Amino acid sequence: MFRKLNALLWLRLQVLISNSTLLATLLMPFGITILQNEFLNKNGELNMFLLSTSLTMVLSMGSGYMVSIMMAEDKEKRNLKSLILSGVTATEYTFSMLVLPMLIMLLGMILLPIYLKVDLSGYLFAYVIYLILATISIIFLNLLIGAVSDTQSKAQVYSIFPMLIVSFLPIIALQNDTVQKLLDYSFIGPFVGLLKEGGGELSLGNLGLLLSWVLVLGLACLFVLKNSYKGK
């Protein structure tokens, strides 16, 4: 099993390195954050806001978008068929898709607060749990998109909508109460709310909401992937 996972992770890394567009999209949130901080946040008053928006961009562009593109590329280049014939299961394939996006999110979780000088010591546990569960949710969502996309071009088109929604929903919610309610019940709502309030304890309600998202999207993802396997 570990040999298969190592081979799958190596394949993911090779796809990432060879795809300049994907690599640029992955790095874009960090570049945008640096530019915004240098030109719009000279007094440090927007540190918390920039952290919230930058993390949602890392989620959507870094951890989410890359998954659907990689999945679609596997199908387009018939890598998925080769993996099936080599004995890789849907569960192993899904797990291999979690690793790189999670590492990218962990990098953002650690480096962005340090760069923006945001002290998370009072609510670090809630911050980590909310973000990890949100990351798993968006990975599952993009796996679904990749599973129903026959080509990378289709995956790019289908992925752009959730990417834009996740990236800009918190900003639009500041001006619209209806959008704010949608945000509250989304998988990014708990950590956006945590940063907006400047702290807080781990909420059982928010935890239940995030676990529900993970469960629903995870089951849907495995169902679609297993059907994809049967169809090959």
Where are these regions (language model features)?
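Short alpha-helical transmembrane interface motifs in multi-pass membrane proteins
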Residues: 52, 60-65, 95-96, 122-130, ...
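Hydrophobic alpha-helical transmembrane segments of multi-pass membrane transport proteins
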Residues: 47-113
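Junction motif at the cytosolic side of a transmembrane helix
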Residues: 144, 211-232
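Transmembrane helix segments
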Residues: 35-42, 148-188
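N-terminal Sec/SRP start-transfer signal
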Residues: 1-21
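Alpha-helical transmembrane segments and their short interhelical loops
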Residues: 90, 98-150
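Hydrophobic alpha-helical transmembrane segments of multi-pass membrane transport/permease proteins
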Residues: 14-41, 50-66, 158-170, 208-218
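Terminal transmembrane helical anchor/hairpin motif
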Residues: 170-215, 219
